[in-house]
Regions:
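Non-catalytic substrate-recognition and accessory regions of acyl/acetyltransferase enzymes
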Residues: 1-158, 176-185, 199-271
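Conserved acetyl-CoA-binding loop-helix of GNAT-fold acetyltransferases
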Residues: 158-175, 186
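An acidic- and aromatic-residue-enriched active-site/binding cleft used to recognize and process polar
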Residues: 188-193
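Solvent-exposed beta-hairpin/edge-strand motifs
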Residues: 195-197
Length: 271
């Protein structure tokens, strides 16, 4: 079996392991034709490139997972971290399916971090090595300083104990596996750090406890809360007709219809 055949075989296995066969009710070949005709070209490329076609990009993510596994093995990174990290492919494929009814990926650029050995899922949270794109003068932090950014993938609550365990793993993981990557801070840029949410979720909620981990150093107006809580592709003129499925959605819808502004906030946490 040559390298391309191995990559296609691995992609097929991941397609099934991540539940895409059940989601689409189609096997690997049926779901990804005609994109499969480009498999060799995608796999042989020196760098990961996204085509902009959702189906082709899903195939690219699955094929490059096999290259990523080779990188993990060279760096002696745990298999468990590899599989948890690339599970995000299935999450984003499911997200795209939920609002479009189509096979593919719409947020493929985000997965570049996973597939190029920069982002790792360590328990509940994801951690990504990247330079700061903001400043925090009171902390002596300038743009370009190496950080480890924190991301919260869909699936599961923000249980404080689970988050504690993730941070503990990250504090051990990066010095062990990437000792040359010196960083002083974790950072997080998220709608979940928006204090405007507190009247909706309460001060004793998991979201509130997560916010309290960070020193907030900035915020920008954003519709991210509507996208993550209501529907990923929702437009402002569609909010009134949206049917809430839970209390949080109902409360957020009410606030959005009253013209409440929500934000994405940036916070930092000392390593």
């Amino acid at each position: 079996m040559n390298n391309i055949e191995q990559a296609i075989s691995f992609a097929r296995q991941e397609y099934t392991r991540q539940g895409l066969d059940a989601l689409y009710q189609k096997d690997f070949e049926e779901a990804l034709l005609p994109a499969l005709s480009q498999a060799a070209e995608i796999y042989r490329a020196d760098t990961l490139r996204w085509s902009g076609d959702p189906k082709t990009d899903l195939l690219a993510a699955l094929l490059w997972s096999q290259k990523l596994l080779n990188d993990y093995q060279r760096h002696q990174l745990p298999d468990e971290v590899f599989y948890h990290t690339i599970d995000d492919i299935g999450r984003w494929a499911s997200e795209y399916w939920s609002y479009s009814g189509k096979i593919g990926l719409a947020e493929s650029a985000w997965l570049t971090n996973h597939l190029t050995l920069r982002l790792f899922q360590l328990g509940r949270l994801q951690f990504c090595m990247e330079p700061a794109d903001f400043s925090a003068p009171s902390f002596g932090l300038e743009p370009g300083e190496p950080l480890v950014s924190v991301h919260i993938c869909r699936g599961g609550s923000l249980d404080p104990a689970a988050c504690d365990a993730s941070f503990a793993r990250a504090r051990a993981f990066f010095p062990k596996h990437f000792p040359a990557y010196a960083f002083r801070f974790f950072s997080c840029h998220s709608w979940l750090l928006d204090e405007t949410l507190l009247p909706l979720v309460g001060v004793y909620s998991n979201i509130s406890f997560f916010q309290q981990r960070f020193q907030i150093v900035g915020r920008t107006a954003s519709n991210a809360a509507a996208r993550y809580v209501l529907r990923w592709d929702i437009q402002p003129d569609e909010i009134a007709a949206f049917i809430p499925q839970n209390r949080f959605q109902s409360q957020l819808k009410t606030q959005l219809l009253s013209q409440q502004q929500f934000y994405e906030a940036t916070g930092i946490l000392a390593r």
